[in-house]
């Protein structure tokens, strides 16, 4: 046992402190708070007081077990969560020397490589620098990709996923596996040349130094013999590997999480790590915080009916601390009726200062609700950027086609759509200054098939420019083959569903315009209206609009979950069992945000394409 871990001694002061720290806690919370040595897994359901339990456990270590505060490490997934926990500790802490180390995985791991690998804060690549390096690689290579914000964001995501998970198919949809490997090596060369590291490099370097340098590993094990981890269900394999090295043989790991709230699979999180924790640590004590202090009994029981359908989970029986709560399944004939009734309720709710929320699966659905609120003068807080469909990758492609069709497109527009769908036309065939199909034909002199493709592209663009707006967009999607090609680039059903939804929004916008020129003007206006950037729209209003993901950790008096029809919830079609379970967990998270009232609404009309009810509601129909 490290010297910094004191032995437990009994004295009146410790007994008094123990009683005070256990006061107000239920039996499960008491067991977690009083835990001292060895691993512990705390399964904390929604509203079960996990932060209260973690803070009390830290205080118990210090006041009862005599642990030095500076030897306690508390790891969270976001800076905001670390700050909140630190503030709550400081508000309740007694007069002690020092305090625990609160931080995110990235901040803790960077402090390690900062000390032992001699990296400085200035060595961290900024988002702008990272995109500059990617742009340089694309300019120097022959990847055939447009150099725009969408491409940059996708490649940043691919790089991160590759570093964390080692997935070699990361570039699917943009680059082949071989192209991605080449791109990745060139990107890393740029980073090394400028002596920069990104957030994912922090983890890789930290793992490397802890693996190879025993004295460094033991130094940090001695420094932090007690480790607490919040939201453990969101951990990825690389983070877990480093965490285990820090814990060492003592394994004083106190991990808190809920497998039923694991909703970040797209970021590389692996809830299986939490599920396997008792097997990896057979001596681990497992505690379930099963009392929900947030929601009324009806809401807690309804949420349990939904999540019990999942197979890969720890069995749990959550109970509400109080009776009451209201859950209503409401059917509407049309989307318009659904909007009218919900917003009518919310207008009165906002006037009463009642904390309300509309939670949707996707940002796209949220934006529709935001527009309807604005029409009616209902103030709201919006936790997503109001992004026009024309700012999405597919929207930008359509606009490029339309501008080229009218004859006022740029060289960048042509490069953007040159191989969407794939025409196997080289970027070198496009003139350096202006669009010139004659020059393109000359570039492919003697290659009849390639010249045929050039002529076909020119004809397609000319046709588009002469059509009404809606027909032009439909023609690009169907006859030209853009929609089919884009669907082929999607790697799963969720991506396909999102793409089709975006294209449908673009087509609806086109129906409002007569000419292509009018549609281009409309798209430009929407872009200017949304030019405030990625900041959250925050006003002094009790009404919040946010996605299921964004709502995690929050609570509201009244929650509306609209549009609960198959295809929307769950998002996508033909999902794998694993994907379906994560979708159900998202729905469960959204349900458990409600304290008093939960309204679940869906469409049921033979005239609606989305007439089938979400499968997630079926257990509730039988239960309610």
Task: Report residues per predicted region.
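A basic/glycine-biased coupling hinge at the interface between accessory DNA-binding modules
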Residues: 2-19, 37-38, 46-48, 59-210, ...
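Conserved RecA-like helicase ATPase core segment
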Residues: 2-9, 16, 21, 237-332
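N-terminal pre-P-loop "Q-motif" helix
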Residues: 21-37, 238
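Helicase P-loop NTPase motor core
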Residues: 42, 46-54, 58, 282-285, ...
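Conserved helicase core region in the C-terminal RecA-like lobe
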Residues: 101-111, 228-231, 256, 362, ...
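SF2 helicase catalytic motif II
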Residues: 220-237, 254
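ATPase/helicase motor core of nucleic-acid motors
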Residues: 323-325, 349-472
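Accessory C-terminal helicase-associated subdomains
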Residues: 445-550, 571, 597-599
């Amino acid at each position: 046992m490290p010297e910094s871990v004191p032995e437990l001694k009994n004295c009146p002061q410790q007994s008094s402190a123990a009683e005070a720290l256990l006061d107000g806690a239920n039996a499960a919370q008491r067991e977690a708070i009083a835990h001292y040595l060895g691993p512990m897994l705390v399964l904390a359901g929604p509203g079960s007081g996990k932060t209260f339990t973690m803070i009390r456990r830290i205080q118990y270590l210090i006041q009862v077990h005599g642990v030095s505060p500076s030897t306690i490490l508390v790891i969270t997934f976001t800076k905001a969560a670390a700050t909140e926990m630190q503030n709550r500790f400081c508000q309740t802490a007694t007069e002690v020397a020092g305090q625990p180390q609160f931080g995110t995985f990235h901040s803790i791991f960077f402090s390690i490589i900062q000390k032992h690998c001699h990296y400085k804060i200035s060595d961290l690549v900024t988002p702008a620098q990272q995109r500059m390096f990617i742009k340089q690689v694309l300019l120097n290579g022959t990847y055939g990709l447009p150099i725009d914000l969408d491409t940059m964001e996708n490649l940043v995501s691919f790089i991160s996923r590759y570093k964390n998970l080692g997935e070699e198919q990361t570039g699917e949809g943009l680059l082949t596996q071989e192209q991605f490997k080449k791109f990745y090596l060139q990107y890393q060369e740029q980073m090394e040349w400028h002596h920069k590291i990104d957030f994912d490099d922090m983890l890789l370097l930290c793992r490397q130094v802890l693996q190879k340098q025993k004295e460094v590993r033991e130094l940090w094990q001695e420094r932090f013999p007690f480790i607490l981890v919040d939201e453990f269900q969101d951990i990825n394999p690389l983070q877990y590997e480093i965490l285990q090295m820090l814990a060492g043989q003592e394994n004083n790991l106190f991990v808190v999480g809920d497998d039923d709230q694991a909703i970040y699979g797209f970021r590389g999180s692996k809830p299986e790590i939490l599920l396997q924790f008792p097997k990896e640590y057979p001596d681990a004590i497992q505690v379930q915080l099963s009392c929900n202090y947030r929601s009324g009994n009806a809401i807690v029981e309804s949420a349990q009916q939904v999540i019990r359908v999942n197979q890969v989970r720890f069995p749990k029986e959550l109970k509400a601390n109080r009776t009451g709560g209201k859950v209503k399944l409401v059917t509407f004939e049309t989307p318009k009726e659904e909007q009218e009734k919900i917003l009518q309720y919310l207008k009165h709710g906002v006037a009463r200062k009642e904390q309300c929320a509309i939670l949707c699966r996707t940002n796209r659905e949220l934006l529709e609700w935001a527009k309807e609120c604005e029409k009616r003068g209902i103030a709201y807080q919006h936790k997503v950027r109001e992004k026009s469909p024309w700012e999405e990758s597919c929207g930008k492609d359509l606009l490029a086609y339309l501008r080229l069709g009218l004859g006022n497109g740029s060289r960048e527009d042509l490069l953007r759509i040159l191989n969407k769908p794939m025409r196997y036309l080289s970027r070198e065939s496009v003139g350096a200054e202006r669009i010139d199909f004659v020059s393109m034909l000359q570039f492919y002199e003697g290659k009849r098939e390639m010249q045929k493709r050039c002529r076909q592209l020119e004809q397609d663009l000319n046709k588009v420019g002469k059509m009404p707006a809606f027909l032009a967009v439909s023609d690009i999607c169907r006859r030209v083959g853009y929609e089919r090609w884009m669907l082929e680039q999607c790697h799963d059903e969720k991506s396909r569903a999102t793409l089709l939804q975006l294209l449908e929004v673009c087509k609806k916008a086109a129906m409002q315009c007569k000419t292509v020129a009018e549609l281009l003007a409309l798209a430009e206006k929407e872009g200017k209206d949304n030019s405030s950037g990625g900041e959250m729209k925050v006003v002094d209003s009790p009404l919040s609009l946010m996605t299921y993901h964004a709502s995690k950790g929050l609570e509201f008096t009244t929650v509306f979950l609209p549009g609960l029809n198959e295809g929307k919830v769950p998002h996508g079609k033909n999902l794998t069992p694993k994907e379906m379970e994560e979708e159900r967990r998202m729905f469960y998270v959204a349900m458990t945000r409600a304290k008093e009232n939960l309204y679940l609404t869906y469409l049921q009309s033979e005239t609606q394409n989305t007439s089938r009810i979400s499968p997630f509601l079926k257990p509730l129909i039988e239960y309610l």
